[in-house]
Design a protein with these regions (language model features):
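Glycine-rich beta-strand-centered segment in the early N-terminal region that forms part
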Residues: 1-52, 64
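Hydrophobic beta-strand signal
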Residues: 17, 36-37, 59, 119, ...
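Glycine-rich cofactor phosphate-binding loops and adjacent beta1-alpha1 units
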Residues: 110-114, 153, 157-232
Length: 293
């Protein structure tokens, strides 16, 4: 359930990139041919919009032009993060920008610039994006705990200082012994009560447990006696203005080869074979799936 979606059927999707084919007469921020992220289908009589990126054509909103014109444009804040990609960036890399910008901006909101040790729970694309972005921000000692050996191997390729198979009790104990209230930051990309509680064993005084995952259900349930002198911060939802600010550094990192998109995108399909892409996600054989029109 997502509270922003109140009517079904709905068009899902927000991790998309496409070329501008037509612009309105008052548009100043985009031109035909620009590669732009986060286009989407708006609400209409047939479908509601759950960001609406799963479509061949979408709409972007010129936030700057609307503000300058003092225009009343519905959902204009969506335009804050609908940004132009640099010349030479491929659409596949551009489609990864959303995950990377959301995680990079979350790290900025948490405040990690002077931190030394980070633990990430989870080994999916969001966890690996946090790893990549934290490395860009200067954190060198980053550990990843997950349940899939192949994805942990990818984490090592992306620069993790160490990885642990979370479902293996022996490896889990090694992690507990290593982190034992010594981590500056714990990033929970799963968001269950179990994983939040697991972070309690790792975080040091004045540290921060940052919950990004959405799996905690209706209620947060953690043992109160364990809550001592650290923060639990929820960063599950991006702040558009902060996400927009990190567009350039994330784009630069991709263009400079500091983030290897090929380590994230494991499956590519034509839109005609979209069911294969969804199945790869369901089977957990994929990290990121790209569907091309």
């Amino acid at each position: 359930k997502v509270r922003e979606v109140t009517r079904y059927p709905a068009v899902l999707g927000h991790e998309d990139a496409g070329r501008v084919v037509k612009i309105g007469k008052k548009v100043t921020s985009f031109k035909v041919g620009d590669l732009v992220v986060r286009a989407g289908q708006p609400d209409n009589e047939k479908f509601s919009s759950a960001w609406g990126g799963f479509a061949e054509y979408g709409i972007v909103k010129d936030y700057k032009a609307a503000m300058a014109d003092q225009a009343d444009v519905k959902d204009i804040n969506l335009g804050i993060t609908q940004q132009v990609c640099p010349e030479g960036m491929q659409a596949e890399a551009a489609s990864m920008l959303i995950t990377l910008k959301e995680t990079y901006s979350a790290l900025k909101r948490i405040g990690v610039e002077d931190k030394k040790k980070m633990v990430i729970l989870g080994d999916g694309p969001v966890a690996l994006a946090f790893l990549s972005c934290a490395k860009l921000m200067g954190i060198q000692e980053i550990y990843v705990l997950g349940n899939h050996r192949d994805k942990l191997e990818t984490a090592e390729k992306l620069g993790a200082a160490g990885t642990f198979l979370n479902k293996d009790e022996e490896e889990k104990k090694k992690a507990s012994d290593l982190f034992d209230r010594k981590s500056d930051i714990c990033i929970d990309t799963i968001g269950s009560n179990q994983t939040i509680t697991q972070c309690l064993d790792y975080i040091k005084e004045t540290g921060t447990i940052a919950v990004y995952g959405l799996k905690s259900g209706e209620n947060l349930n953690v043992p109160l006696p364990e809550l001592r002198n650290f923060n639990i911060q929820y960063v599950q939802w991006p702040v558009p203005e902060v996400e927009a600010e990190v567009h350039k550094p994330v784009c630069d990192a991709i263009m400079d080869g500091k983030i290897d998109i090929d380590l994230f995108v494991t499956h590519r399909f034509s839109i005609d074979d979209y069911e294969k892409g969804f199945q790869a996600v369901k089977d957990r054989t994929a990290l990121k799936v790209v569907l091309n029109f």
